[in-house]
Regions:
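Residue-level signal for beta-strand positions within conserved beta-sheet cores that form or flank
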Residues: 31, 68, 121
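Conserved beta-strand-loop-alpha-helix junction that forms the acyl-donor binding cleft
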Residues: 71-82, 98-103
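Conserved acetyl-CoA-binding loop of GNAT-fold acetyltransferases
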Residues: 86-96
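Conserved GNAT acetyl-CoA-binding A-motif
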Residues: 62-73
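Acetyl-CoA-dependent GNAT
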Residues: 1-43, 129-130, 140-143
Length: 144
């Protein structure tokens, strides 16, 4: 149990679950909220539904709270997700180096102090309230 996280299921227009999106750290701080666990589980689902759901969730966060920015972290090799986040106006802030460790088939990533032995990076991206709402027409005209 983690009281600082909330997970939402995303359904298509036929009430079929196609993925999930979440919030983290929103109960700890009112200035910055993490968009978390963004997954489109059904690869056959209509393209763009997770993007629209994420846009609406971010809108709700900004309307319902005094939060000025939302952020997320994504693996640097997840080009599809990064493209989606850029279309939602998230900007790259920094990259954190990670070392991949495999133990008995379980993969875990460890943060590194330097880039020297990094296997991959965690991209930290942010979206400001004003940038989000300026993007409304682009998102609403999106047809997947």
């Amino acid at each position: 149990k983690n009281d600082s996280k909330v997970l939402f299921l995303v359904f298509d227009n036929h009430d079929v679950p196609i993925g999930h999106i979440g919030l983290a750290d929103g109960l700890i701080t009112d200035s910055l909220v993490e968009m978390d666990n963004i997954v489109r589980g059904d690869k056959t689902a209509q393209k763009g539904l997770i993007s629209l759901a994420l846009y609406e969730l971010i809108s709700w966060v900004f309307i319902s709270t005094s939060c000025k920015k939302v952020y997320l972290r994504v693996f640097s090799d997840n080009f599809k997700a990064i493209s989606i986040y850029e279309n939602l106006q998230f900007t790259h802030i920094n990259k954190e180096p990670l070392k991949k460790n495999v133990n008995e088939g379980v993969i875990k990533y460890e943060f590194l102090e330097s880039n020297k032995n990094a296997d991959i990076y965690f991209c930290y991206m942010e979206l400001a309230r004003n940038d989000h709402f300026k993007n409304y027409e682009n998102i609403k005209n999106f047809n997947g």
